[in-house]
């Protein structure tokens, strides 16, 4: 299986995503934002960072990159797509997932191990989890507060489109503690925390007393590998 990671000007976590894919047993494929070729990949990752310096709005300029027309088309045909942090912002700007992301309510950049609850384990990216499972994934952003209209929020909650929720203290003012969502079809998932930074043991707090931030993120990538192979 081949999973593409798209690099944009200002991407920071593309190499981490490529490594996570390799550790999950798939072939990572580096893709460039200026191309119109997905190179026959089976799934896509839009990584974190500060694409185009976060000018205008986070993810706004990147969502208009040449390769995004191929991403939108592939997502429409059912290809699994994962947007992480800045990638989530791109997905929202491209209207591939509902809602939007704005400045954290406290106005500060945050970087810590974040406790999450899995709300939907039926997407290609979350099939390795169980609904209600508690996990810890690193979180780092300045504009990660999830917003949506009251009507849209009701639909998200009612149709199971919330995929992850912050557990404990809400770190950025996201409505309903929402950390990640999916599209209606379920193949496109966006979240602010960084699963690609939690794929190997020994990184982050990993004692029984502390929040665990070691390998919880690996399940995102092994899940999509299994899902794609089953469908094949």
From Swiss-Prot:
InterPro entries: Class_I_gatase-like (IPR029062), PRibForGlyAmidine_synth_PurQ (IPR010075)
E.C. designation(s): 6.3.5.3, 3.5.1.2
Gene3D superfamilies: 3.40.50.880
Signal peptide stretch: none
Domain Glutamine amidotransferase type-1: 2-232
Location of this chain's protein in the cell: Cytoplasm
Catalysed reaction, written as an equation: N(2)-formyl-N(1)-(5-phospho-beta-D-ribosyl)glycinamide + L-glutamine + ATP + H2O = 2-formamido-N(1)-(5-O-phospho-beta-D-ribosyl)acetamidine + L-glutamate + ADP + phosphate + H(+); L-glutamine + H2O = L-glutamate + NH4(+)
Highest taxon of the lineage: Bacteria
Molecular function, one GO term: glutaminase activity
Active site annotation, chain numbering: 85 (nucleophile), 194, 196
Pathway note: Purine metabolism; IMP biosynthesis via de novo pathway; 5-amino-1-(5-phospho-D-ribosyl)imidazole from N(2)-formyl-N(1)-(5-phospho-D-ribosyl)glycinamide: step 1/2
GO annotation (BP), single: 'de novo' IMP biosynthetic process
Recorded coiled-coil stretches: none
Any one annotated GO CC term: cytoplasm
SUPFAM superfamilies referenced in this protein's UniProt entry, alphabetically: Class I glutamine amidotransferase-like (SSF52317)
Keyword line: ATP-binding, Cytoplasm, Glutamine amidotransferase, Hydrolase, Ligase, Nucleotide-binding, Purine biosynthesis
Function: Part of the phosphoribosylformylglycinamidine synthase complex involved in the purines biosynthetic pathway. Catalyzes the ATP-dependent conversion of formylglycinamide ribonucleotide (FGAR) and glutamine to yield formylglycinamidine ribonucleotide (FGAM) and glutamate. The FGAM synthase complex is composed of three subunits. PurQ produces an ammonia molecule by converting glutamine to glutamate. PurL transfers the ammonia molecule to FGAR to form FGAM in an ATP-dependent manner.
Subunit record text: Part of the FGAM synthase complex composed of 1 PurL, 1 PurQ and 2 PurS subunits.
Protein name per UniProt: Phosphoribosylformylglycinamidine synthase subunit PurQ
Annotated source species: Leifsonia xyli subsp. xyli (strain CTCB07)
Lineage: Bacteria, Bacillati, Actinomycetota, Actinomycetes, Micrococcales
């Amino acid at each position: 299986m081949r999973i593409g990671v798209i690099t944009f000007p200002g991407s920071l976590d593309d190499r981490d995503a490529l490594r996570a894919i390799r550790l999950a047993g798939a072939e990572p494929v580096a893709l460039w934002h200026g191309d119109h070729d997905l190179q026959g990949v089976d799934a896509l990752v839009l990584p974190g960072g500060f694409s185009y310096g976060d000018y205008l709005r986070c993810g706004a300029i990147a969502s208009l990159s040449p390769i995004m027309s191929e991403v939108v088309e592939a997502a429409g045909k059912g290809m699994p797509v994962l947007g992480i942090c800045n990638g989530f912002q791109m997905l929202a700007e491209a209207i591939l997932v509902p809602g939007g992301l704005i400045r954290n309510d406290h106005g500060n950049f945050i970087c810590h191990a974040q406790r999450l609850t899995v709300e939907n384990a039926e997407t290609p990216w979350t099939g390795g989890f169980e609904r209600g499972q508690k996990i810890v994934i690193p979180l780092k952003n300045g504009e990660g507060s999830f917003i949506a209209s009251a009507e849209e929020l009701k639909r998200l909650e009612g149709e199971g489109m919330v995929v992850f929720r912050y557990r404990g203290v809400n770190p950025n003012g996201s409505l309903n503690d929402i950390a990640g969502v999916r599209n209606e079809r379920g193949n496109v998932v966006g979240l602010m925390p960084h699963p690609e930074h939690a794929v190997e043991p020994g990184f982050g707090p990993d004692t029984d007393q502390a929040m665990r931030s070691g390998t919880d993120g690996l399940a995102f990538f092994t899940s999509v590998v299994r899902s794609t192979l089953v469908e094949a």
